[in-house]
Amino acid sequence: PNIEEIKLWGAIYGAALRPCVPLFVMITGALLLPVRGDTSAFYKKRITRVLYPFFIWSVIYNLFPWITGWLGFSPQIILDFFPYAGEEVMRQSFSVAVKYILNIPFNFSILAVHMWYIYLLIGLYLYLPIFSAWVEKASERAKQMFLLAWGVTLLLPYYYQFVDGYLWGTCSWNSFGMLYAFAGFNGYLLLGHYLKNLDWSMKKTLATGIPMFVIGYVVTFFGFRHMTALPDYTDEMLELFFTYCSLNVVMMTIPVFMLAKKVNIRSERIRKALANLTVCGFGVYMIHYFFTGPAVMLTRAIGIPIPLQIPVAAVMAF
């Protein structure tokens, strides 16, 4: 395959899709803030519903290499499903699988990379009732001040990369700087809650949103391309301009959220179909990583043009 062309189209699609995860978090904030009812009931309903499928599917993913060996398959099949799997999993060893499973409470493995979002989601659910108490009583001005402070933190990844690794009190013995309490995905929670009640006309939404999205996309795309053009780059440098909690990604996310608010589906059939899709969404997310590798291989095998391989593979996987 033409590696340079694959990298180009990966950047084109990857940059455009950066708002997806932030949008999910914003929707969570829009729907759940402020939290109603008892905190224990909220935790039981939300976290339990996520925790059990998360653990079961994490175990299945981590057992997969051992199962392929037990069934007599070549280690190559592991790379077919998980192209970035490390050398350790190629051993198809039960002890390696057990090691990965025991590590589930602490982090995801190379075989279940997409589970990073579930750790985040559980953390957000834990935080929501606590954050909600402030959101319920805070004035619009207070919420705006929080979002402003959060906005400043969106520039920190670039400061740390290009200027200095320490800022505002961070040092070798302190990772929690001055604006730490405002940083991270909790800003997206509040942003979703805040924008839910912001009523813009379609004209204003487009006039503001299109330039905002374009600027955010240009920074994301060309920043990523610049990093991948360097002769030597780390994983952190590779992901820098794709960082979800960065200003350029927020600039793409806000217009999409505001535009989505304007969508009014009147067809009852379509509304039911979307509702059913929503019900299945979490399960689809759990299992889809099994299909990404084979889907990409299939698109190449049947001669799908490189510019179309990513969207076609995505449709196959989901």
Feature roles, as predicted:
Residues 1-318:
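Alpha-helical transmembrane segments and their immediate juxtamembrane cytosolic regions
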